[in-house]
UniProtKB/Swiss-Prot annotation:
Its EC number is 2.7.-.-. The keyword Transferase applies. This is Capsular polysaccharide phosphotransferase WcwK. GO terms for biological process: polysaccharide biosynthetic process. One of its GO terms (molecular function) is transferase activity, transferring phosphorus-containing groups. The gene is wcwK. InterPro entries: Stealth, Stealth_CR2. It comes from Streptococcus pneumoniae.
């Protein structure tokens, strides 16, 4: 790998048990006509797995430069905020005061353009994304380009989905990019055997001249900070509209817009589709527990299922499975 610069990780976290935070959230919910399908309680629910996120990073990605741990202000009581690789960032440290407080993950993530010390190359995690096996820098960046999958996928409207937000992203992408030119300039990046059966999607969508959407596999995204800045300069109005939303709203954008921009620009290197997998937690998390044992995928997303009947019981099973996989404390934990 040539000219590889340092790579940072960024992860966002919320403590839904923080009394003050819950009180403020409740007060603002009364003022705003929020979309429940985009702001359900499950989207804020904390599973007690954050310490295992750090243990996984230390074990499987010790090469990481800095970890930007972004919160409203609270930190887990076990976290050593003085760790040399850890940068604890409060919302007030990089988001303009006029947009605070915010309970909108899109505001938190899209404001990364204002995080001055963040490396040009970084990987954005949600707190439900876990490294599940040894990874290299080249799994995320190669020749200074992000690793990703250039797979087309039409948008399908579903209840309780992000489709309205993704549609806003795609409207901007179609404003600046021509599918014909994308394929003329980067054909091999979109028709690549690394995509496996998903390659059929690109073949089937060839007759359509417009970009109908991209496949989102819900794993950490590799970003170049300069791409965030480029899109912000061109579309600052929609950024600022998003920043004003205290809660997620159907009129805004999310960070996938920058991912789509990188894909449409050809500024990426194709990555094997089996690098990561998205799992939805259900009443029976056996498939996730088995994945933790077998490590078939290097990255996993453990997506909160909104139909869990016994949250505490399932949470206990998950914590037990992670404890078995990562029994040793990381250096990010207080002694």
């Amino acid at each position: 790998m040539k000219n590889m610069e340092q790579i940072d990780f960024v992860v966002t976290w919320v403590n839904d048990k923080d009394v003050d935070w819950c009180k403020r959230k409740s007060e603002f919910e009364k003022e705003y006509n929020i979309f429940q399908d985009l702001n359900s309680e499950e989207r804020y629910r904390e599973w007690g797995l954050m310490k295992y996120w750090f243990r996984a990073v230390e074990k499987y990605a010790p090469w990481v430069n800095k970890i930007y741990f972004i919160t409203e202000g609270h930190v887990p009581n076990w976290l050593d905020v003085n760790h040399p690789k850890l940068v604890h960032v409060k919302h007030e440290d990089y988001i303009e005061k006029q947009f605070l407080p915010t309970f909108n993950s899109n505001v938190i993530e899209m404001n990364l353009i204002h995080l001055k010390d963040l490396s040009e190359k970084f990987v954005l995690f949600n707190d439900d994304f876990f490294i599940n096996d040894f990874v290299k820098q080249s799994d995320f960046f190669e020749n200074n380009l992000p690793k990703d999958t250039g797979i087309f996928s039409p948008l399908i409207p579903r209840e309780n989905s992000l489709t309205p937000i993704i549609l806003n992203n795609m409207e901007i992408i179609n404003k600046y990019f021509s599918k014909k030119k994308i394929l003329e300039q980067n054909f091999s990046k979109f028709f690549n055997i690394k995509y496996g059966k998903h390659l059929l999607k690109n073949i089937c969508l060839l007759p359509w001249s417009d970009l109908l959407g991209f496949y989102d596999n819900h794993i950490p995204v590799s970003y170049c900070k300069s791409n965030f800045l480029e899109v912000y300069e061109k579309e600052h109005a929609i950024f600022n509209l998003t920043f004003k939303n205290k809660f997620r709203n159907k009129n805004e954008i999310n960070h996938w817009l920058i991912r789509y921009w990188q894909l449409s620009s050809g500024n990426f290197i194709p990555r094997n589709i089996n690098f990561g997998k998205n799992y939805a937690i259900s009443n029976d998390p056996t498939d996730i527990i088995n994945e933790l044992k077998l490590s078939k995928y290097k990255i996993i997303c453990i997506n909160d299922g909104e139909s869990i009947d016994n949250f505490d019981a399932v949470k206990g099973l998950m914590i037990n499975a992670f404890e078995k996989k990562f029994p040793e404390k990381s250096s990010f934990e207080k002694k």
